A protein has these predicted regions:
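Sec-dependent N-terminal signal peptides
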Residues: 4-13
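Structural preference for beta-rich elements and adjacent junctions enriched in aromatics
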Residues: 16-241
């Protein structure tokens, strides 16, 4: 009985500790980033990338089968994401071309941003190897609104050892509290490898926990004195090289 109680206590502590253990400091940049999926800008060689994803399915808690490296940068108008999704069998990458907000049989990479840092609300941005895009709003920690649409850019490239992607997300598409002082946002990354039926996250999502956004890690180093409300109008184009 004591053993079971002690184990339950350890697990409950673990479920609430992601936002302390998993943290990343955003890269502040003035570099012009060309969204072509190639990760050849200097910013994508800065600092240590996020890695070490853990499976949610099919083997919860086990390391993801394929390596992922991610960096996040920011300027006065945009959040940028550069990710390399290694794959030792690139010919097996699932890359079905889909309409915007489609799902289908495809590999995926996503970022989740809790820009209010309320541990209940998250803006999600997904991209596939074919360049297909999805966006959604998570609210009440676990609920999802797939009808939410943002204006943002991405491009993916399939290489001989995996695929890479770049995202450019206008700050005007997010909701946050402007401040002259450094603020923190909730952060997580997701990868789906379709042929394995595998879903993995940077900050682990424990099935035993009732929450989703509340299990995110932390994005640090953000200073945004004012909220950008510039209107963005961009066409949706699904493409890959």
């Amino acid at each position: 009985m004591f053993k079971k109680t002690f184990l339950a206590l350890l697990l409950s502590i673990g479920f609430g500790s992601n936002n302390f253990k998993y943290s990343y400091t955003v890269i502040t940049t003035n570099e012009e980033i060309n969204i072509d999926g190639n990760l050849d800008e200097l910013v994508w060689k800065t600092g240590t990338p996020i890695s070490n994803f853990s499976q949610k399915d099919p083997q919860p808690g086990e390391p993801a089968r394929q390596k992922t490296e991610v960096r996040v940068a920011i300027d006065n108008e945009y959040i940028y994401v550069g990710a390399y999704l290694f794959d030792n069998s690139p010919d097996s990458i699932a890359k079905q071309i889909l309409r915007k907000d489609g799902w289908g049989y495809s590999d995926w990479f996503a970022i989740g941003l809790d820009s209010y840092y309320d541990k209940r609300t998250c803006f999600g941005f997904h991209v596939s190897p074919s360049g297909s895009m999805r966006d959604m709003l998570h609210y009440n920690d676990t609920d999802t609104d797939d009808s939410w649409d943002a204006i943002w850019e991405s491009k993916s490239v399939i290489n001989n050892d995996g695929w890479s992607t770049e995202m450019k997300i206008p700050l005007s598409q997010l909701r946050y509290n402007p401040s002259e002082e450094e603020q923190r946002w909730g952060l997580n990354f997701y990868r789906r490898t379709a042929r394995y039926g595998e879903e993995s996250f940077w900050a682990p999502i424990f099935m035993e926990s009732k929450g989703f956004v509340s299990q995110f890690g932390i994005l640090k180093g953000i200073i945004l004195p004012k909220q950008n409300r510039r209107i963005e109008v961009l066409p949706y184009i699904s493409s890959t090289d």
